Amino acid sequence: IKKNYKAKLDANFIYLPAPLDSKKFEKIDNIEKKKNQIIYIGRDSYEKGIDILKNFESKINGEIIYCTDSPWEKTMSILKASKLLIVPSRMESIPQVIKEAFYLKIPVIATNVGGISEIVENGTTGILIPPENPEKMIDAINNLLDDDLLIDQLTKNAFEFITKNFTWDVLL
């Protein structure tokens, strides 16, 4: 982002991403993971791609929980109990929910739109899927649900990335 604006405007910028307040997570209870529980967190809107997810829900080897209007602590408790987070967006900046999932060590499968690829590195911190590609999303979800080794690798890398780059302690 900084490079693009510097080139266009010939000005110096400081890129300050929205931080993650890791202290807020101390309030979230330890919850046992639910086998193959998948979570969607976001608005019920076209931009967020919730309709795409609902259209192929029956082809998923798990249960999708939709958190579209819940208080933050309740949503984070459900996220913490989930096996993975799905972000099927058509348009997006850098979703805070991905940072939250990284911090809670929940793997992320997201569409490669907007700023998502600035934090989700495909195969390293999460899985990126081309937008509007339900078949690839279905395959990625079902494959990841069955691959605990990959889940461990992704969540370890994602947690390390988020704590080194996006917490208040690092940014201040």
Short names for language-model regions:
Residues N122-G123, I127-P134, N143-D148:
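Conserved acidic donor-binding segment of nucleotide-sugar-dependent glycosyltransferases
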Residues S77-S82:
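Short alpha-helical donor nucleotide-sugar binding micro-motif in glycosyltransferases
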Residues I1-E26:
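Donor nucleotide-sugar binding/catalytic pocket of nucleotide-sugar-dependent glycosyltransferases
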Residues P107-A110:
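Short hydrophobic beta-strand element within catalytic cores of glycosyltransferases
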